[in-house]
Amino acid sequence: MSTTTNKKPIRVYVDGCFDLMHFGHANALRQARELGDILVVGVHTDEEIAKNKGPPVMNEQERYKAVRACKWADEVAEGAPYTLTEEYLDSLNCDFCVHGEDISVGADGKDVYEGIKKSGKFRFIKRTEGVSTTELVGRMLLCTKDHLQNVSGEQTSPLGGVNPNVLHKQSPYTSLSHFLPTTRKIVQFSEGRSPKPNDKIIYMDGGFDLFHVGHTEALKQARALGDYLIVGVHDDRVVHEQKGSNFPIMNLHERVLSVLSCRYVDEVVIGAPFSVTKDMIDSLHINVVVHGDDQVVLGPEGGVDPYKLPRELGIYKEVKHTEGLTATEIVKRIIDNRLQYEARNRKKEAKEINFIEQSN
């Protein structure tokens, strides 16, 4: 007789702000999910974040939706407390809490997981090097985007006069670092499911920079049109040619991992061509090509419509933009509140350094 048939599922809890939800967050959820059967994700309110850390870039409703779109999140606990208690963990029927190696300090300067650690219901997971919300805000504030310099040969930043020393590099958790892409990470994020012979295959492409709820809602609609969703992610040069200025904020590998973490996505074409070609349609067995209902940006070579062929074949469809959010809008939020976010990053780092010094 098997002893596993009536085994109680292990419920794992992880919490956070999940501001500017990125592949580092997704990787934490992936690792946490591997430790049990059901992953419950607690997301803090705007008020809690402002009190303990500084103002979030994305509001709580946007952050709740972003977490729900991650394929490793089974349940979302909205309005989770910033300082976790054993009572709250028990109220969710969770067996233990998981957090990265980086420290999390509350408004009082104390470790927010201190009580849970003492209770023995705490597990560590590895932090994803080279990406954090603070780091992404730093890129937008200081334009420390090596990948963009390589694409365009120059920086064209509206914040070109910002002092690069505004964000210090002393805390190991709040430094500007570099994500090193590996094939293993792509495999870990990939679904690994192949389309079935009779599956209706949907294709949607784009830059997917600063992957946000506007993207996930569009992908959800696209996936509903068929059985298998393939997403084409444009390379850095294509995104820069179309968006100009400081885009993309995130490089190709970072954007690919963000898209792969989405529960509506089955497969990703890395560095997809700007125009949808006959070869692509034939080789990927595409039945429907999807784009948002915003204006299609024409290609640089004589103003070519990238969806000309799908339109002619009668396989082109549009989905509604329901969120009204773009990467440009997110960057604008940062720039409009630049001083607030610079202060937030400094405050966060200062608390971390102080905590490290007191712990040593």
From Swiss-Prot:
Pathway per the UniProt entry: Phospholipid metabolism; phosphatidylethanolamine biosynthesis; phosphatidylethanolamine from ethanolamine: step 2/3
Catalytic activity: phosphoethanolamine + CTP + H(+) = CDP-ethanolamine + diphosphate
GO molecular function: ethanolamine-phosphate cytidylyltransferase activity
Keyword Nucleotidyltransferase: yes
Binding site for CTP: 207-208, 215-218, 243, 291-294, 321-325
CDD domains: CCT (cd02174), ECT (cd02173)
Entry's Gene Ontology BP terms: phosphatidylethanolamine biosynthetic process
EC number: 2.7.7.14
Keywords assigned by UniProt, alphabetized: Lipid biosynthesis, Lipid metabolism, Nucleotidyltransferase, Phospholipid biosynthesis, Phospholipid metabolism, Transferase
A cellular-component GO term for this protein: cytoplasm
UniProt keyword Zinc, yes or no: no
Top-level division of the source organism's lineage: Eukaryota
Function: Ethanolamine-phosphate cytidylyltransferase that catalyzes the second step in the synthesis of phosphatidylethanolamine (PE) from ethanolamine via the CDP-ethanolamine pathway.
Family: Belongs to the cytidylyltransferase family.
Protein name per the record: Ethanolamine-phosphate cytidylyltransferase
